Design a protein with these regions (language model features):
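Non-catalytic helical/linker scaffolds that mediate oligomerization, partner binding
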Residues: 1-479
Length: 479
């Protein structure tokens, strides 16, 4: 069983039912809808198609709606792309103009107020770099230090500059409301800078009467500085290495990735490693050796999931990319689960203590499975963060939790009806394991649950169960 999960970005390359079915067969666990591109109708079609085919498979696939965020961009040019040479003077203005080689507008009207002489501005993911030489009320005059081509709507990064853009743009607010109504399982918030950025998201969720987990995308230096409070405030994180590698010195990214994974694991929150995982497979049927090693290292860091972007959304080999990533993960885990660093901190909650004890008992007894009964998914996440070699089954009566646990490392989620007693829970486990052939009569499983059932966050019990005892009615409670 593969433990680390795979996130696939949906797009034109995987529009057909056959392609979506092939993605799920190859190993997709979560589908990402990137709201930087496309309209609501096409995203709704993709969401509905994934849901339909996942239901046919009996296989949960989570849906992530990824908000564009307040991306700062150049405006449009009147006569196409322009090549900028070293030491050219290039002005970025808040005026509404059709751009020329010397002067172009920007989507961010606060740019002159945030910049000062000496600051660097990176254009198109750092392909072009300019240095601020003069600032006026409307214009930022710069000198080109890294030459290259500029064209319509290219992104701007301001490394080391504390920009004053809001956490949510007007587009993001509308997109968030759409995602909640459409049935998303997770929301991803782009360009997070502090823990406070979640407040506006929660306000809109409360207005809509829908609360779902929010993933913070770590792609700004301020987010790295505030990473501990961000992990505490959000429901998970994504190490978005594209913008992160532009805003930070690129040599800092590997250790930032490891630190993010470590903190998320300690907090029992999912962490996704993203960007350029198998980038060359956009146009090639096989990845580079470096990409394969990158995927393996993310697995060994302990990431919950690895994400494919252009590889699946617009690539020539989307299904092959998923299958390749699945093979890399499986091979790495097959020989290297023990290489994932164990958590050194002691749990500070009742649920954390019980799940840790369950994993330790399971290892001593050679248990076939660790089993969590959970309404919110919290017990399953706390068990998963231990990265035990024992497979985890998570039973839940909540459809949303059933889908969301598809993102959690090592967890196979099961939809089960609510019962009124823990003995009924054990019967559910027995029936599933025996009827599916997952475990043999007489093998052991370790179960964690809340007693009485039905109270979220009430995990307070651990039971060692011998498979077959419940369906055989060996005790009066099972009859």
């Amino acid at each position: 069983m593969r433990r680390a999960k795979i996130v696939c970005t949906m797009g034109p390359a995987v529009e057909s039912p056959e392609k979506v079915r092939a993605l799920i067969d190859a190993g997709m666990n979560m589908a990402r809808l990137n709201l930087s591109h496309g309209g609501y109708d096409e995203h709704q079609e993709r969401l509905d198609l994934v849901r339909k085919i996942a239901l046919e498979h009996g296989h949960p696939v989570a849906i992530l709606v990824d908000l564009q965020g307040p991306k700062i961009r150049l405006g449009r040019f009147a006569d196409g792309p322009h090549d900028l040479a070293k030491d050219d003077i290039f002005t970025i203005t808040t005026d509404e103009i059709e751009g020329t080689k010397d002067r172009v507008g920007t989507t961010y009207k606060g740019l002159p107020g945030d910049c000062k002489p000496g600051d660097l501005i990176l254009i198109d993911d750092g392909k072009v770099t300019v240095q601020v030489v003069e600032v006026s009320q409307t214009d930022v005059r710069t000198r080109v230090t890294e030459p290259g081509t500029v064209s319509n709507n290219k992104g701007i990064n301001l490394p080391g500059i504390a920009v004053s853009v809001p956490a949510l743009s007007e587009k993001d607010r509308a997109d968030l409301r759409w995602g909640l109504k459409a049935g998303a399982d997770f929301i991803a918030l782009s360009f997070v800078r502090s823990a406070d950025d979640i407040k506006d998201v929660h306000q809109i969720m409360d207005e809509e009467g829908i609360r779902i987990p929010v993933i913070a995308k770590i792609e700004k230096p301020q987010a790295v500085q505030n990473i501990e409070s961000i992990v505490a405030a959000f429901d998970g994180i994504m190490v978005a290495r594209g913008d992160l590698g532009v805003e930070l010195p690129i040599e800092d990214v590997p250790l930032v990735q490891k630190r993010c994974v470590e903190l998320a694991r300690e907090a029992a929150k999912p962490v996704i490693v993203a960007t350029q995982m198998l980038e060359s497979m956009i146009s090639n049927s096989r990845p580079t050796r470096a990409e394969a090693t990158d995927c393996a290292n993310a697995v060994l860091d302990g990431a919950d999931a690895l994400m494919l972007s252009g590889e699946t959304s617009v690539g020539e080999f989307p299904v092959e990319a998923v299958a390749m990533m699945a093979r890399i993960i499986e091979k790495t885990e097959g020989d290297g689960l023990q290489r994932i660093r164990p958590l050194l901190h002691n749990p500070r909650t009742k649920g954390g203590a019980i799940t840790k004890a369950a994993a330790e008992v399971g290892e001593i007894l050679g248990a076939k499975y660790l089993v969590a009964f959970t309404q919110s998914g919290d017990s399953a996440r706390r068990m998963a963060r231990l990265r035990s070699a024992i497979p985890i089954l998570a039973f839940t009566p909540e459809v949303g939790t059933y889908h969301r646990m598809a993102l959690t490392w090592g967890v196979e989620s099961m939809l089960a009806p609510m019962v009124n007693h823990t003995d009924e829970m054990v019967k559910q486990v027995d029936s599933l394991l025996v009827e599916s052939g997952r475990a043999a009569i007489g093998e052991f499983v370790v179960i964690v649950a809340g007693a009485p059932p039905g109270i979220p966050g009430s995990t307070n019990a651990m039971r060692v169960h011998r498979v077959g005892d419940a369906i055989a009615g060996v005790a009066p409670a099972y009859r």
